[in-house]
């Protein structure tokens, strides 16, 4: 287990987590996977994606991409929805489901950050602390 020394002054990732639901969880399992060079054959993201679908996890938060990506290298996609053009920005989603034994399952799935890794790590710790 990795422990990172933290204080109230070091919780600079808090403002980057956008909660749509803020559940209080006990004994939760947290799984995170990110696309990128370390996701050989998409093994990690496929596994976490499968578990997210298997346990019907619903989105409870996102990590704001603005601070963590160079959008010249991780480009948003554009799509048409009816007569309107929509931009889909890269996103890291936090989802919540329930395991067969009743424990909460929290998954984080998205794109490996390109910038501000320490701040991104603090944002993940914010999710884990909840």
Where are the model-predicted features located?
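Internal, conserved structured core segments that host functional sites
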Residues: 101-130
